[in-house]
Amino acid sequence: MYRYKISVEYLGTNLAGWQRQSGVMSVQQILEEAIYKFSGEQVTLFGSGRTDAGVHAIGQIAHFDLSKYFEPYKIIRAINYFTRPYIVGVCNCELVDNNFHARFSAIARHYVYRILNRPYPSVIDFDRVWWISVPLDVSAMQKSSLYLLGKHNFTSFRASSCQSKSPIKTLTKLDIIKENEEIKLYFSAPSFLHHMVRNIVGSLVLVGKNIWQAEQMQQVLEVADRKAAGPTAPACGLYFIKADY
């Protein structure tokens, strides 16, 4: 068997997320069907992260096995041909060792969340950013984010449907950068809880609106109660950037 590692980008607006689900269109299903159309083989695609409905990806990593060898550049061309008309595409493909696993071999995952902070929305990016019309205090958000760095119990930022065995995670990076009218929040960790990034963003926005003091984030983290944290930020602003191996 030949194992292929692919890098995938997609707009998740009209998709049900990464994972294959009955009755709806997912990124996994689109790619698996495209692979079948050019190879004649039914494969199971394994991704480095399971993005939710509406979440986008710049460099989602996945792998699959084929019994027949194909040149990687031909796989890129074939998948991109058969994924049309969906906005899902393969950017890179390489042959890897059979011990490689897109999910379990990953040592870090990286996300960015985009906030458009201006009085009027974007026609072009309306489903690719979270538009917030009131000015946000970025310096307060940056100060508050420091309480979240490191190894903590992130129960307060965990979805009720999360299947992770432990709420303990290590957030290695949380950078908040203002670029003109956009605020970008960069997250890195070995792994994340379900909705963890979006729940943190929703809480930081409360700080940015001066509804919360920056120091309140520490209390929310320590109480380990989802009800104590802010709302879940919309899926449209979240992007899976890449995974490290």
Swiss-Prot record:
Q: Which domain of life is it from?
A: Bacteria
Primary enzyme class: isomerase
Keyword annotations = Isomerase, tRNA processing
> What does it catalyze?
uridine(38/39/40) in tRNA = pseudouridine(38/39/40) in tRNA
Keyword hit for Ion transport:
no
- InterPro entries given for it? PsdUridine_synth_cat_dom_sf, PsdUridine_synth_TruA, PsdUridine_synth_TruA_a/b_dom, PsdUridine_synth_TruA_C, TruA/RsuA/RluB/E/F_N
Q: Report the active site residues.
A: D52 (nucleophile)
Q: Which SUPFAM superfamilies match?
A: Pseudouridine synthase (SSF55120)
Which NCBIfam families does UniProt cross-reference here? hisT_truA
Q: How does it assemble?
A: Homodimer.
Annotated protein name in UniProt = tRNA pseudouridine synthase A
Provenance organism: Rickettsia bellii (strain OSU 85-389)
